[in-house]
């Protein structure tokens, strides 16, 4: 008996609760909830797109859910206005089908414009999510060209990974060359110079291109290279030139 009474009382209380809910407040609360939900999803989609984990099936599921929710919101906004029992209106409300200037109270013109803007924004969002659903469904099917491009990128990454591992295992003996490209060509790079290479060991110990530095820095100065070449190539005995030349004696008058 108690179970039968409970089964009849609970639906009655639930129906009374639905009657006490103001449809206008419920509609505006739902619109506010949709706005917050949309902003949250937009903020979440940015890092997910950057990380490339927003896969097409997930995108289809998310956008279909948002599409359905906004369809329900638009149907409530364009539904019958029965908030005032004395002025029941079947069909879309007047603030959507008529101009806001027909309002008897001029203070309601601003609210009418807000309702129109909200309804138009809802329709735009529905169209946007419908387009995103189509794009997401199309992305679920990979073409042969896209599959070949993805395989080529994976092969290139695998080759680069193997080359890096080989360089890390043998850093001294392995030449600094770029890995083989998928097309078969290679790119030669300049060899590096370390503290154990011959070029580094002879750095600073060889002859300089400055003749005066080699001439005066050694114990036995030698003439510059240009002077030696001129002496060997010129015929006959020529007086030896010094640098700088000695001063000439002034002639007596």
From Swiss-Prot:
Q: Which UniProt keywords apply?
A: Membrane, Transmembrane, Transmembrane helix
| Protein's UniProt keywords contain Membrane | yes
Give the induction text.
Expression is increased during growth and development.
Which portions of the sequence form the region Disordered? 174-253
Query: What broad class describes the main subcellular location of this protein?
Result: membrane
Question: Per the UniProt record, which residue ranges are transmembrane?
Answer: 23-43, 53-73, 117-137
Amino acid composition bias (Pro residues), ranges on this chain: 242-253
Q: Where in the cell is it found?
A: Membrane
Q: Which GO terms describe its cellular component?
A: membrane
Extract the coiled-coil ranges from the record.
Answer: none
Q: Locate the compositionally biased regions of type Polar residues.
A: 184-200, 226-240
Which topology term describes how it sits in the membrane? Multi-pass membrane protein
For this UniProt entry, which residues form the secretion signal?
none
* Phenotype upon loss of function: Causes the inhibition in mycelium growth and induces conidia formation, corresponding with reduced expression of brlA and abaA. Results in elevated production of kojic acid, via increased expression of kojA, kojR and kojT.
Role, per record: Involved in mycelium growth and repression of conidia formation by affecting the expression of brlA and abaA. Acts as a negative regulation factor for kojic acid production through affecting the expression of kojA, kojR and kojT.
Q: Please state what the protein is called.
A: Kojic acid related protein 1
């Amino acid at each position: 008996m108690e179970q039968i009474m409970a089964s009849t009382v609970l639906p009655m209380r639930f129906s009374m609760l639905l009657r006490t809910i103001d449809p206008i407040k419920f509609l505006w609360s739902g619109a506010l909830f949709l706005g917050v939900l949309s902003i949250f999803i937009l903020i979440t989609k940015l890092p997910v797109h950057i990380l490339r984990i927003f896969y097409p099936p997930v995108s289809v599921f998310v956008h279909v859910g948002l599409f359905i929710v906004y369809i329900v919101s638009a149907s409530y906004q364009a539904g019958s206005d029965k908030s005032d029992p004395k002025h029941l209106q079947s069909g879309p409300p007047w603030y959507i089908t008529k101009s806001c200037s027909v309002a008897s109270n001029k203070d309601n013109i601003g609210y009418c414009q807000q309702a129109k803007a909200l309804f138009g924004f809802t329709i735009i969002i529905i169209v946007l999510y419908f387009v995103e659903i189509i794009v997401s469904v199309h992305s679920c099917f990979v073409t042969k060209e896209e599959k070949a491009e993805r395989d080529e990128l994976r092969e290139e990454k695998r080759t680069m990974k193997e080359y890096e591992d080989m360089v890390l295992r043998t850093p001294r003996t392995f030449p600094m060359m770029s890995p083989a490209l998928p097309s078969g060509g290679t790119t030669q790079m300049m060899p590096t110079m370390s503290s154990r290479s011959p070029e580094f060991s002879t750095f600073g110990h060889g002859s300089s291109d400055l003749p005066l530095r080699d001439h005066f820095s050694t114990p036995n100065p030698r003439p510059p290279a240009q002077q030696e070449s001129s002496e060997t190539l010129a015929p006959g005995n020529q007086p030896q030139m010094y640098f700088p030349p000695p001063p000439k004696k002034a002639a007596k008058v």
